[in-house]
Curated annotation (Swiss-Prot):
This is Integrin alpha-IIb. Changing Y174H: In GT1; abolishes the binding function of alpha-IIb/beta-3 for soluble ligands without disturbing alpha-IIb/beta-3 expression; functional defect is likely caused by its allosteric effect rather than by a defect in the ligand-binding site itself. Ca(2+) 2 binds at D328, N330, D332, R334, D336. GO terms for biological process: angiogenesis; cell adhesion mediated by integrin; cell-cell adhesion; cell-matrix adhesion; integrin-mediated signaling pathway; positive regulation of leukocyte migration. The keyword Zinc does not apply. GO terms for cellular component: blood microparticle; cell surface; external side of plasma membrane; extracellular exosome; focal adhesion; integrin alphaIIb-beta3 complex; integrin complex; plasma membrane. The lineage of its organism: Eukaryota, Metazoa, Chordata, Craniata, Vertebrata. The gene is ITGA2B. Ca(2+) 1 binds at E274, D276, D278, T281, E283.
Length: 1039
């Protein structure tokens, strides 16, 4: 029994699942003539799902109303029996009275059987259809049961439809699947012809001849069936109070044992049309969205239920056949078919499937041919929008001779509120882009567009209107079509403009200019349009150019455009207006080749805010024409240049990491006719930057160049003349800086070309300049000794003899590496050879190796074998004053015969003449400007030194370095390597000697004797005899 509820409950689940999911961006909207501003709304009871189905209804007097189904309306017993409402048409809307039907459960005893109907949750109004003055409202979940003694048929949703004539008050009911067969019989017959789960009326339509056709997707145990009966016979055979009766003229489709139909929901949607060429018969279009294991299909049957065509879905579970519609969209007089698949999934660029929905258009060919492949696919654009859930023929909405359609996406549009898209018919079928997009005026979850009806003129203005149901909001919106004004626009202008013919004068400056006339003509036609019509005409000159770069202007205003208000008379015959324009001076613009485009656009005058215009403008509202400038290019007025370009480069190769500057030297020539807007185009590689460009043309030494992007590549464009005249030759030198070459490869390429805007042979051949890229690094190794020299006594004093507490002075050998660039180096290896291994016979005791700057060093053999704490005070000589070994003033004197005579010449102590300590250092990477240093701390080993009292030494260390690679993909010019040596001079001082006393006495006496002789000589020459200057008293006495 639960299975019987599947079809519509599944539908409801499909429609409600995505109310909480967000939609994608809406497609652009092109407004046509459905007024989206001045809407009419009808509302039903809250929670009734008012708007689940709807249709137009005309009574016998031609009055139009809207019949609306609300399948969850509460009945008299406050149970959800459903309901149907009839809304009289008023522009301002209004109340919708409900149609009265018998909504009570019924029980009748017929012989030994008890017949029962159950109308709670029957879904009255799940489908409604109007024909003539009759309204058909169906309740597909009305349940039925037959009891006989201890047996029953089981309570199942056979479905039923109620018919009403509102004017006469007549009522009837039609339930083609009711029967009195018990469940046991169905089981014995393997459920053949089992109609207990029909859900008759799930879909419904009435033919022009008045035959009611019902889809019952649960019939024959969910294979589906179709029931047909004339409306008149239903009324005539109906007897109130009788629950089981027979319409003699009805017909039902056949049961099938084909597995493809199992659970296919055949009858889920239904439509009628003409598809066999016989105008006296009507064919049935039946949708089965889960046919053949959810592939879906639509079948076209004749009046005897014989299949004429079968259209298969293209994607599993797309629900192909959820909706069907029949209309003639290409104006050939034959019905065409549209099929909706709202769950169709599209494969997108990210290889993910997106559920967007799709509508298939099948154009009926001439002759008795199958429909074949779809002529057009309309695919939704919004994720989970359910595009194609409903399709409605609109009639000829814009009165162009072709019928149009509306397609709903109930969960598309802004915030998933719903959207209806209008597609216009044309001779090829339908236009692939919507002419108008109607966004829901209701909040999210309204399912705006779940039901649609069109093709009826509700306001009697000669244009068909559209009604849209939004059962989630319990409302219906009426969109009225506005009259369409079809404009005809003509623009006349001369073919060419000769700059040399200056027949006009600018009013302000009296400057002669070349001028020409522009004639504009505008007319309008349309059905039921106003007698007086006002249009705005906007004229734009040279519209493809920026406003400041327009080449032609209006003579009077010197502007590039104008707007005119045109009043069309009662017959709307074309009116014309002429204005004059002029060509600007050639020095004021560059482009002399491209056509000068003039455009005329016609529009309706603006309306007040919130008000829609009374008519819609359509047709040729925009027209453009073009003229051109006469050039000095021979009789054909077509210039054909012959552009030549040669180029070379200086400053190569390029070095990675360096600030490279290249000079591109180019020679440009034109051996043909003038090249207009000629320019040199230089495509710069990655890392290159334009600096400046110079030419050898007098007066134009510095070229005007600009940069722009073309296909993600920076291009330098330098002007070469407008035009670049015949036989012109220009030498160009362009400076370009190039950096960031780490990923450039072994070369970079400059692409050079001369371009022009000429139509024939506009460009030169492309010249490629390949500049090699190389890597290089200059690494410098320097060494230093601290101090550079030492002075040590030649002999050992008593206090220091055999003493291990007093070490010799410190000696430091420092090696510094500096990468001067421009590149980075990898795998730097430094090897330092030091004389001595800290043994008693060595002159140096090596205390420690101190690397800096990332170096990792490993000495061999290990240093400081005695574990001397070199943090304790050890004599450290000043680099300015060489250190001496400390001695007391009292000297030790050797016996006279043993005194040394003189010091020996310095002896070189290196790894070539002494045991050696080797220090190996490695640095993984050394960037440009980086420094690294190794300091070797040592002190003199005095016991070994004093064993050779007269020897002087030069202590020499030696260092080498090399680099294994440079971290670039380009070959290096060379791998850095080098060496350095450090020397420390070790000098000896002899013992001081005592001075004899007689040497002192002789020196004193000699000094006194020399002083006496000096005084006597000075006295002899009168040095001590002086004349005093006279005093004042002496002068007075003299007077």
């Amino acid at each position: 029994m639960a299975r019987a509820l599947c079809p519509l409950q599944a539908l409801w689940l499909l429609e409600w699942v995505l109310l909480l999911l967000g939609p994608c961006a809406a497609p652009p909207a092109w407004a046509l003539n459905l007024d989206p501003v001045q809407l009419t709304f009808y509302a039903g009871p809250n929670g009734s799902q008012f708007g689940f189905s709807l249709d137009f209804h005309k009574d016998s007097h031609g009055r139009v109303a809207i019949v609306v189904g609300a399948p969850r309306t509460l009945g008299p017993s406050q149970e959800e029996t459903g309901g149907v409402f009839l809304c009289p048409w008023r522009a301002e809307g209004g109340q919708c009275p409900s149609l009265l039907f018998d909504l009570r459960d019924e029980t009748r005893n017929v012989g030994s059987q008890t017949l029962q109907t159950f109308k709670a949750r029957q879904g009255l109004g799940a489908s409604v259809v109007s024909w003539s003055d009759v309204i058909v409202a169906c309740a597909p979940w009305q349940h039925w049961n037959v009891l006989e003694k201890t047996e029953e048929a089981e309570k199942t949703p056979v479905g039923s439809c109620f018919l009403a004539q509102p004017e006469s008050g007549r009522r009837a009911e039609y339930s083609p699947c009711r029967g009195n067969t018990l469940s046991r019989i169905y089981v014995e017959n393997d459920f053949s012809w089992d109609k207990r789960y029909c859900e008759a009326g799930f879909s419904s339509v009435v033919t022009q001849a008045g035959e009611l056709v019902l889809g019952a997707p649960g019939g024959y145990y969910f294979l589906g069936l179709l029931a047909q009966a004339p409306v008149a016979d239903i009324f005539s055979s109906y007897r109130p109070g009788i629950l089981l009766w027979h319409v003699s003229s009805q017909s039902l489709s056949f049961d099938s044992s084909n597995p493809e139909y199992f659970d296919g929901y055949w009858g889920y949607s239904v439509a009628v049309g003409e598809f066999d060429g016989d105008l006296n018969t009507t064919e049935y279009v039946v949708g089965a969205p889960t046919w053949s294991w959810t592939l879906g299909a639509v079948e076209i049957l004749d009046s005897y239920y014989q299949r004429l065509h079968r259209l298969r879905g293209e994607q599993m579970a797309s629900y192909f056949g959820h909706s069907v519609a029949v209309t003639d969209v290409n104006g050939d007089g034959r019905h065409d078919l549209l099929v909706g698949a709202p769950l169709y999934m599209e494969s997108r660029a990210d290889r993910k499937l997106a559920e967007v929905g799709r509508v298939y258009l099948f154009l009926q060919p001439r002759g008795p041919h199958a429909l074949g492949a779809p002529s057009l696919l309309l695919t939704g654009t919004q994720l989970y929008g359910r595009f194609g859930s409903a399709i409605a023929p609109l009639g000829d909405l814009d009165r162009d001779g072709y019928n149009d359609i509306a397609v709903a996406a109930p969960y598309g549009g802004p915030s998933g509120r719903g959207q209806v898209l209008v597609f216009l018919g044309q001779s090829e079928g339908l236009r692939s882009r919507p002419s108008q997009v109607l966004d829901s005026p209701f909040p999210t979850g309204s399912a705006f567009g779940f039901s649609l009806r069109g093709a009826v003129d509700i306001d009697d203005n000669g244009y068909p209107d559209l009604i849209v149901g939004a059962y989630g909001a319990n409302q219906v919106a009426v969109y009225r079509a506005q009259p369409v004004v079809k404009a005809s626009v003509q623009l006349l202008v001369q073919d060419s403009l000769n700059p040399a013919v200056k027949s006009c004068v600018l009013p302000q400056t009296k400057t002669p200019v070349s001028c020409f006339n522009i004639q504009m003509c505008v007319g309008a036609t349309g059905h039921n349009i106003p007698q007086k019509l006002s249009l705005n005409a906007e004229l734009q000159l040279d519209r493809q150019k920026p406003r400041q770069g327009r080449r032609v202007l209006l003579l009077g205003s010197q502007q590039a455009g104008t707007t005119l208000n045109l009043d069309l008379g009662g017959k709307h015959s074309p009116i014309c207006h002429t204005t004059m324009a002029f060509l600007r001076d050639e020095a004021d613009f560059r482009d002399k080749l491209s056509p000068i485009v003039l455009s005329l656009n016609v529009s309706l005058p603006p309306t007040e805010a919130g008000m829609a215009p009374a008519v819609v403008l359509h047709g040729d509202t925009h027209v453009q024409e073009q003229t051109r400038i006469v050039l000095d290019c021979g009789e054909d007025d077509v210039c054909v240049p012959q552009l030549q370009l040669t180029a070379s480069v200086t400053g190569s190769p390029l070095l990675v990491g360096a600030d490279n500057v290249l000079e591109l030297q180019m020679d440009a020539a034109n051996e043909g006719e003038g090249a207009y807007e000629a320019e040199l185009a230089v495509h710069l590689p990655q890392g290159a930057h334009y600096m400046r460009a110079l030419s050898n043309v007098e007066g134009f030494e510095r070229l005007i160049c600009n940069q722009k992007k073309e296909n993600e590549t920076r291009v330098v464009l330098c002007e070469l003349g407008n035009p670049m005249k015949k036989n012109a030759q220009i030498g160009i030198a362009m400076l370009v800086s190039v950096g960031n070459l780490e990923e450039a490869g072994e070369s970079v390429s400059f692409q050079l070309q001369i371009r022009s805007k000429n139509s024939q042979n506009p460009n030169s051949k492309i010249v490629l300049l390949d500049v090699p890229v190389r890597a290089e690094a200059q690494v410098e190794l320097r060494g230093n000794s601290f101090p550079a020299s030492l002075v040590v006594a030649a002999e050992e004093g008593e206090r220091e003899q055999n003493s291990l507490d007093s070490w010799g002075p410190k000696v430091e050998h420092t090696y510094e590496l500096h990468n001067n660039g421009p590149g980075t180096v990898n795998g730097l290896h430094l090897s330092i050879h030091l004389p001595g291994q800290s043994q008693p016979s060595d002159l140096l005791y090596i205390l420690d190796i101190q690397p800096q700057g990332g170096l990792q060093c490993f000495p061999q053999p290990p240093v400081n074998p005695l574990k001397v704490d070199w943090g304790l005070p050890i004599p450290s000589p000043s680099p300015i004053h060489p250190a001496h070994h400390k001695r007391d003033r009292r000297q030790i004197f050797l016996p006279e015969p043993e005194q040394p005579s003189r010091l020996q010449d310095p002896v070189l102590v290196s790894c070539d003449s002494a045991p050696c300590t080797v220090v190996q250092c490695d640095l993984q990477e050394m960037a440009r400007g980086q420094r690294a240093m190794v300091t070797v701390l040592a002190f003199l080993w005095l016991p070994s030194l004093y064993q050779r009292p007269l020897d002087q030494f030069v202590l020499q260390s030696h260092a080498w370095f090399n680099v294994s690679s440079l971290p670039y993909a380009v070959p290096p010019l060379s791998l850095p390597r080098g060496e350095a040596q450090v020397w420390t001079q070790l000098l000896r001082a002899l013992e001081e000697r005592a001075i004899p006393i007689w040497w002192v006495l002789v020196g004193v006496l000699g000094g006194l004797l020399l002083l006496t002789i000096l005084v006597l000589a000075m006295w002899k020459v009168g040095f001590f005899k002086r004349n005093r200057p006279p005093l004042e008293e002496d002068d007075e006495e003299g007077e």
